[in-house]
Amino acid sequence: MHPVNPFGGQQPSAFAVSSSTTGTYQTKSPFRFGQPSLFGQNSTPSKSLAFSQVPSFATPSGGSHSSSLPAFGLTQTSSVGLFSSLESTPSFAATSSSSVPGNTAFSFKSTSSVGVFPSGATFGPETGEVAGSGFRKTEFKFKPLENAVFKPIPGPESEPEKTQSQISSGFFTFSHPVGSGSGGLTPFSFPQVTNSSVTSSSFIFSKPVTSNTPAFASPLSNQNVEEEKRVSTSAFGSSNSSFSTFPTASPGSLGEPFPANKPSLRQGCEEAISQVEPLPTLMKGLKRKEDQDRSPRRHCHEAAEDPDPLSRGDHPPDKRPVRLNRPRGGTLFGRTIQEVFKSNKEAGRLGSKESKESGFAEPGESDHAAVPGGSQSTMVPSRLPAVTKEEEESRDEKEDSLRGKSVRQSKRREEWIYSLGGVSSLELTAIQCKNIPDYLNDRAILEKHFSKIAKVQRVFTRRSKKLAVIHFFDHASAALARKKGKGLHKDVVIFWHKKKISPSKKLFPLKEKLGESEASQGIEDSPFQHSPLSKPIVRPAAGSLLSKSSPVKKPSLLKMHQFEADPFDSGSEGSEGLGSCVSSLSTLIGTVADTSEEKYRLLDQRDRIMRQARVKRTDLDKARAFVGTCPDMCPEKERYLRETRSQLSVFEVVPGTDQVDHAAAVKEYSRSSADQEEPLPHELRPSAVLSRTMDYLVTQIMDQKEGSLRDWYDFVWNRTRGIRKDITQQHLCDPLTVSLIEKCTRFHIHCAHFMCEEPMSSFDAKINNENMTKCLQSLKEMYQDLRNKGVFCASEAEFQGYNVLLNLNKGDILREVQQFHPDVRNSPEVNFAVQAFAALNSNNFVRFFKLVQSASYLNACLLHCYFNQIRKDALRALNVAYTVSTQRSTVFPLDGVVRMLLFRDSEEATNFLNYHGLTVADGCVELNRSAFLEPEGLCKARKSVFIGRKLTVSVGEVVNGGPLPPVPRHTPVCSFNSQNKYVGESLATELPISTQRAGGDPAGGGRGEDCEAEVDVPTLAVLPQPPPASSATPALHVQPLAPAAAPSLLQASTQPEVLLPKPAPVYSDSDLVQVVDELIQEALQVDCEEVSSAGAAYVAAALGVSNAAVEDLITAATTGILRHVAAEEVSMERQRLEEEKQRAEEERLKQERELMLTQLSEGLAAELTELTVTECVWETCSQELQSAVEIDQKVRVARCCEAVCAHLVDLFLAEEIFQTAKETLQELQCFCKYLQRWREAVAARKKFRRQMRAFPAAPCCVDVNDRLQALVPSAECPITEENLAKGLLDLGHAGKVGVSCTRLRRLRNKTAHQIKVQHFHQQLLRNAAWAPLDLPSIVSEHLPMKQKRRFWKLVLVLPDVEEQTPESPGRILENWLKVKFTGDDSMVGDIGDNAGDIQTLSVFNTLSSKGDQTVSVNVCIKVAHGTLSDSALDAVETQKDLLGTSGLMLLLPPKVKSEEVAEEELSWLSALLQLKQLLQAKPFQPALPLVVLVPSSRGDSAGRAVEDGLMLQDLVSAKLISDYIVVEIPDSVNDLQGTVKVSGAVQWLISRCPQALDLCCQTLVQYVEDGISREFSRRFFHDRRERRLASLPSQEPSTIIELFNSVLQFLASVVSSEQLCDISWPVMEFAEVGGSQLLPHLHWNSPEHLAWLKQAVLGFQLPQMDLPPPGAPWLPVCSMVIQYTSQIPSSSQTQPVLQSQVENLLCRTYQKWKNKSLSPGQELGPSVAEIPWDDIITLCINHKLRDWTPPRLPVTLEALSEDGQICVYFFKNLLRKYHVPLSWEQARMQTQRELQLSHGRSGMRSIHPPTSTFPTPLLHVHQKGKKKEESGREGSLSTEDLLRGASAEELLAQSLSSSLLEEKEENKRFEDQLQQWLSQDSQAFTESTRLPLYLPQTLVSFPDSIKTQTMVKTSTSPQNSGTGKQLRFSEASGSSLTEKLKLLERLIQSSRAEEAASELHLSALLEMVDM
């Protein structure tokens, strides 16, 4: 084994070679404890010495040629042993002896004070030997040390130097770890450089010097000396060489395993790029576009031709070239020289181009490019002009002085640069000012202030945060402003402001950011090691970029770091890649990573090495699926990255912190993208880990819903999505994987209902359904794949059912169900889904919600998605069903809606109804067709309590599909030990799976055994052995502690074929071993002796010192610990005593405080109570006083008002009384005055009259004696009876006057008589005016109908009675009009005056004679008062009061003279509203005539005014009324004028009564059978007859079935026509239950009844049947036919009848074929064309017609008549509109073509039908009353069918005889079969002709003619003999053709009657058997 590094604990010495002298061994003082060791650090005398021996050889360059002397040397590194306090390590240095400007080599220099050994073995070619233009063999010779040059080996990140004419050479590396440190590998390189004259080579053997922080330091330029004083590392080498610093075991350190397969040409190309590296940034994933071509040649050309090569700075390294694992000719050294020469040849060709690259520094510029601190480490080459030996010595002195700087300064600078987040100070051009007052935080003020200091570029202010950002044009200005800008305010604090660089953007070139003077800044230490195969990883500051990144959307882990996923290739490629991979990965072992970010960077570096070591496959034949090896729920690297990025969920952190809980972290989902790299095996989880992850989610996460549902759902969804992605990437398909996808599906199904009420930001139902669909699709494919393998999953039926439930709206989902496996298709889950599909698509919401209530929880969650859809459709159906028209509304109870549609409560139902436009009030919903809305989108779904109750177990058990599994216990894998050192467990577990190897090479194996003694066992015990057979890495390989484990560790999982290379020269292993042994022995012979002796002494001293130090440390530590423990105990005891005292004091104070508070509270309570009572009393008293004052004031005011009012009234009354008395007095005085005058005038007139009588005008003729007597009154008084009887009046002296009394009496009698006559005349007129009309006579006389029973219905529309008084003319007119339409013999209804209702006034049902016939007259009079209310309208529509109305009569109210215009318009509007209400409440068809009665004489313009006021023309145009007239009637009813006009109006209404509907009535069965007979039988039997006559095969069954189903569909459309819904028929008052031929029942045209009729008619349809292929075997065809016929019967009891008939038919067909066939085989049978398909369909149709049962009971019981029949009503003219389907027409055309072909072959020869027996045709049943006509018509049709094909008379007799023979054969066959059945049943039935006790209704309704034939005896011989006699009689008689046709018709009818009777009897027998 390799000895422990001898330089671990003592001061090393240094051996250095200068240009002129050799030094001596010199010892320095001991080093400082804790100081890291660095390569090339020149220690001061107080620090350390260097121990170095550099065997080297060199050839000085001569002339002006530029030569590079490759060195072949061995460098050994030392690692810190027990103590890590070494300040320095042995450094190896050599000076360059070349003075040529282009001769650049790496040299290790030391100060003059450092001594060196004089013994340095050098070997190499002689100086000055020149090879011509060719290549010659190199000679080896020892040269003095002053000519030796040490050429360090550059790594992929440390590019070699290159001068103007120099190209870096290629090299090989043989490496092995040395020491117990981090395990670096020793490079073994063969570099070579050629030029035009000299070819030289040298070898450098170097061992790795491992320590905690070994690094190369970059030299310092003269211009930046002050800046480089802060650099922590030391530089070594000449001015022409530059090394950048590296951390522990970094790729650039000695001991780095440099890849041998990286040619020098690529190094030359990368040199141009490495001069100016891009700024550090977060690493982006590699783009596939960038990975297309990675050849070194192409990359070099791109580097040379690209004008801006810095833009390619973020490209990953090129792919490693492919090397075949094959033996090569020549020796090892010869092959090496050849390859180096070839690479240098190509490099020389591109040298001129590379010299123009911008990456090289011009002469005079700085030595190296400045890379910001800590971001990356590279070896930066530079090109410097020629320097002399004096300049080199002066530079060495400066460097040595700088090497002694304190490490503390370097640490401070490193920390400062690290705090900037990996950003160079040169890029900091902005400052950030905080704590700025608001009045100063203004852009103008800040710009003005800082413009005085430097030139400001832009200013950003944020007053809310009291900060501002000021950008300057350069770093110097920003630094000056940061220094002097604090004068703005005393509280202002200024910091640097760093830009946040997006990881998706490329970085700008460094030279655009920096000036020439700034480009020479030194490279800082890199905090991480970097892979030699990839770009360095940038380490951004954890506290800067990460914490200040945008919180909106953080980049995902796998999105930022896209990985490739190709496994390591096999063969030589795999060997080469594995070798370099293991070599590179071994350098990572032991690296310390303290923080999570450092650990992530280290693991990411490991992944990049592994990813670049693999070879991508482009051959699909060799492609294979990934195999995951991740043992944890989340890969380790992702855990560290997400903790760094703060991308952890609340379920993945340690409670109370933001640190990741490694046991609870679950892999996050990463969306796939085009530029994403393929995953590595350890990034994918195998099936077992995925199952454990799912078990963890189910048991630990699913039921955690205490926090945010959004976080819970996002976490579970994301992690299950990641599980699905891992399954997809690994192409897993097994039952375990299926169970994982099933659990994901259950989770999404549960969330579909559970999360439906969450906002869109938390839960998106659409995305959830998409994921559910993807899961179900994956399951469907996996089920199919596993079924193909013979594996059946137990849950397949469950999830296929879920798939169907998810796609219920998909049209072809049933087709997919038919494709399921029979076990799955017939499972309860799939059957349930099919039932849900049927309920949803048929809008059967009752069935749907019943299924929801009976469903499982997950099924109910899926059905919940359709709740809004089914509810909307159900609401639409209810709205249409419960409303009559669009203008009417219907009230429906809200509780019914909640119950039927399964709402949670009334509130949810109300919201849903309001969303669809319906209003809810008082617990009822108002259904209205016009108000119903159908929004475009569905309303927001809500959770259902009914579904929630089904969740009886935890969510985890629901998702798991059963009881929860045990909680998974697993300890996550960690690649770091307790000291945070990388130990590489992941590497040990991944490489055996992902690495492929072709085979072992004996030589390589031997080489590994030879160097096994030098392997560091403790460090590399976990490393795998690299493949020793790789020709690309002929170096010393690493071998683990157990050699036996190496083969298994590197054994390939699969061994792909390797193409055999072309034959090449073969060299043996002995040659290789010999050459390598010689080289190693010669190079190490002297060096190993010195190193071993010094190492032994060092180890001895170190052991002694370490023992003493350990004892001292243990003693000191123990003493300190004991003292600390004792002090703590004492302090704790004192603290306890103090706490007890304090608690006692606090308790005492607390009690005192409580006592004081109690007393104080009591006092305050008493005071507050007293104060409160006082305030309340005062307030109460004030209120009472105020109230009393107000009351007193009101009383006084009232009293005063009363007194004033009384005084005023007294004054007013006194004045009024005075005026009244005055006026009365004046009137009385006037009266007295005139009365007195009148009295005086009367007295004067009397006096004058008396005087005139007493004193005549002339002297009296009597004497004087008689004069006095003459003046005395002499009239007779009293009058005597005698004079009175004589008619005389004695006037005395005046004489006697005769008076006639009889004339006066006669006049008196005449007057009295006239008065009586007039009185009775008026009374008769009044009686006549109030007498009812003789409506039956008027109707029978004027109704234009010819039916024997006539119906007429009139609706009187009267004004509102509430608006008129009982004695008003309008009220009298209404009563008069009611009386006119009330008959004496009528059934008078409830005649009331209630407005807003329609009442039956009278109903007439009498017989009336018209001419010589008597008709039944049925009249109904309805009356409506005023406008109807909504409830009255609903009652009218519900009770169908207006159904069958024949006319309307509207009475207008009388016009009042004082009526204003507004009131008149209002009366018109009221009448119009009343009229429109009635017109809209009745069915729309037919339109009715209208009579408008106008009271009083309104003048000539009354008709025009009525038309305009009622808008009668508009009503006519709208087809609401058919016609109208305006009739003026008197406003009084004293004469017959009104009666005459009303009678005329009634006659006009009757004459214009709507025409009678052409409705036909039949029972449902009769209607179907007549339709089938009319439209199907005639066509079908005619086609069958033609095809049989032509010996053609039967018609295809699908065509016959389609014709039959088409006829049924036509019949269903006729009987359920939409025209029937709007018909106003029958008259409701005369309708009967069950209906009749004249009057149907009330619900005959309701939509529900018509829909039931349509469904019932369609129930006769036959299922479709396709014709089997022509070559189908007989038995499968028979099975298909039997299976088809089993679908026809409606019950299992009638199925055997049809089955036996079909089997009998098939047996006869087979027997017929067997008789025709000569030698039939057992497996053969009749062909498909020979099967009588038409007869099979005929049997099915016959059975369907006999065995049909209605689908369910009718909607209304009124549809059933007394005998149980259902009558249907239809328009007869619609039956003529049937169109034959296209398939039947095509079949008929095909038949005609075949007939033509048949006739063409056989000429006019008639073809006799076959004599085989076939079933009878369809049973024809007809309507009662049309039996004879139908029978005769059918007979005539049959005759026409027989004669249709004959055109000549000579063919007539033959056609007739053929038909008779056919009928005869059919009769004979049937009678034989019947006799056979009767003989079998003779024991059970004594009389075979007796009918059974029960007969179907279809058979009972046979025509009478057929019933009479049923009594014919069933014996066959009498019938046959009678038929034969009739036939012979027809043949013998020489009667005419007409008589023959008649005889033929009679025979056919008789034959059919016999068949029907036999069929009837047979059916009866079969039904009795079934009973």
Curated annotation (Swiss-Prot):
Disruption phenotype: Embryonic lethal at 11.5 dpc. GO terms for biological process: nucleosome organization; poly(A)+ mRNA export from nucleus; protein transport; somatic hypermutation of immunoglobulin genes. The modification Phosphoserine is found at S424, S502, S531, S550. Residues 33-335 are annotated as: FG-repeats. The keyword Iron-sulfur does not apply. Residues 232-253 have a biased composition (Low complexity). Residues 8-29, 38-50, 214-224 have a biased composition (Polar residues). InterPro entries: GANP_CID_dom, MCM3AP_GANP, MCM3AP_RRM, NupH_GANP, PCI_dom, RBD_domain_sf, SAC3/GANP/THP3, SAC3/GANP/THP3_conserved. PANTHER family: 80 KDA MCM3-ASSOCIATED PROTEIN, GERMINAL-CENTER ASSOCIATED NUCLEAR PROTEIN. As a component of the TREX-2 complex, involved in the export of mRNAs to the cytoplasm through the nuclear pores. Through the acetylation of histones, affects the assembly of nucleosomes at immunoglobulin variable region genes and promotes the recruitment and positioning of transcription complex to favor DNA cytosine deaminase AICDA/AID targeting, hence promoting somatic hypermutations. Component of the nuclear pore complex (NPC)-associated TREX-2 complex (transcription and export complex 2), composed of at least GANP, 2 copies of ENY2, PCID2, SEM1/DSS1, and either centrin CETN2 or centrin CETN3. The TREX-2 complex also associates with ALYREF/ALY. Interacts with RNA polymerase II subunit POLR2A and with the transcription elongation factor SUPT5H/SPT5. Interacts (via FG-repeats) with NXF1; this interaction is not mediated by RNA. Belongs to the SAC3 family. This is Germinal-center associated nuclear protein. It comes from Mus musculus. The lineage of its organism: Eukaryota, Metazoa, Chordata, Craniata, Vertebrata. The gene is Mcm3ap.
